[in-house]
């Protein structure tokens, strides 16, 4: 019987940090392991999920959800498939505006437009960095090198082009329908 590689079975945060640092230290090895290589000739397995929205600290429910998705990605890699598991962040929405208002204790209407947008950008960037760090610390095997942000000009151009194409085909319609909404500002 072989000797255990970790004779001391107690876990420490320092040991965890060391393992994580080694895991991410060689960027080319990480990219080779988890990066998407469509020209590999392997059967493709594409994971398409709505990207998480950073409106604060990434909570345990979101971490659990992405951990389950990660299990699928890893299992498909073990089955020999080329897995596309992109890392993206949804950086559009009203929640960040509410967060800025809450943090500054000022309503959006009291700001100059550019000043408020700058505060929103700073806040969303801080939350994005924290979420990216948490995702890496959890050990998600997504393709961080191919990160996409929904407020990036290239991302917006693609989504707008798709919207225009669908509109021209008649797949987008205007209609009156009942909807649930929150009347509180």
Specify the residue positions occupied by each region the protein language model found.
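N-terminal, positively charged nucleic-acid-binding surface of large information/translation enzymes
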Residues: 1-185
């Amino acid at each position: 019987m072989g000797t255990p590689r970790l004779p001391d079975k107690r876990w420490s945060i320092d040991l965890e940090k060391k393992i994580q640092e080694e895991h991410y230290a060689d960027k080319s090895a990480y990219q080779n392991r988890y990066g998407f290589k469509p020209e590999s000739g392997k059967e493709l397995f594409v994971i398409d999920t709505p990207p998480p929205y950073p409106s604060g600290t990434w909570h345990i429910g979101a971490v659990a959800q992405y951990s389950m998705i990660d299990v699928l990605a890893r299992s498909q890699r073990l089955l020999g498939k080329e897995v596309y598991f992109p890392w993206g962040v949804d950086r559009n929405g009203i929640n960040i505006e509410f967060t800025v208002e809450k943090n500054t204790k000022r309503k959006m209407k009291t700001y100059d437009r550019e000043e408020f947008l700058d505060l929103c950008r700073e806040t969303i960037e801080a939350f994005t960095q924290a979420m990216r760090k948490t995702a890496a610390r959890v050990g998600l095997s997504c393709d961080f090198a191919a990160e996409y942000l929904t407020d990036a000009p290239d991302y917006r151009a693609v989504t707008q082009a798709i919207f225009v194409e669908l509109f021209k085909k008649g797949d987008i319609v205007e209609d009156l329908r009942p909807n649930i909404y929150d009347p509180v500002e």
